[in-house]
Amino acid sequence: MNKAEAVAGYQTEQMLYMNKPYELSAFSYNAWVDPPADMLFPLFVQSLQASGYFFAVASSPTAESTDYRLDSQLLELHQNFLHNPSVIELKVKVVLTQVTANQVIASAVIKEHVPCPNNTPYGGVVAANKSTELMTKAVTRFVIHHIPPAG
């Protein structure tokens, strides 16, 4: 699995929100400990490994002898105040490649929208944690669905 990337605007530790259509803003006093794409990467690796479907899940782009590679790109992660209650909108693009043939097997854009328990940055964090849990499960299901069992 390659390290997750993020589209422009989401390559930051800033916690982003939307209160006007098509306009992202950042909370002044709140931030993620790392860019969200960097935080998603180990969670995807852990989820794939915990599935028990794979003998090993390599977390290095230079890993030798891998059959498949999963690339991911964070497309959106923000708290949307255009809804009440506000919602966390998380969107990730995943691309699964068969390495030896250098052929894309499948790709998808996976979206999670989770209501925030309250309209504060902390409420966004709670919802972001839930959306991340749902996203890691969805990515794992996507990969397992597209890779035949070893045998």
Question: Could you describe each region identified by the protein language model?
Answer:
Residues 4, 73-77, 111-113:
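Generic short beta-strand segments
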Residues 24-31, 100-141:
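Short secondary-structure boundary motifs at beta->alpha junctions and helix caps
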Residues 51-101, 117:
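Surface-exposed short loop/turn segments
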Residues 50-57, 141-151:
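Surface-exposed helix-capping loop/turn segments at secondary-structure junctions
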Residues 37, 41-45, 51, 129-132, ...:
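Extracytoplasmic/secreted envelope proteins and their assembly/folding machinery
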Residues 1-37, 145-151:
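A structural "domain/chain start" motif
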Residues 1, 44, 72, 92-94, ...:
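Buried hydrophobic packing residues in well-ordered domains
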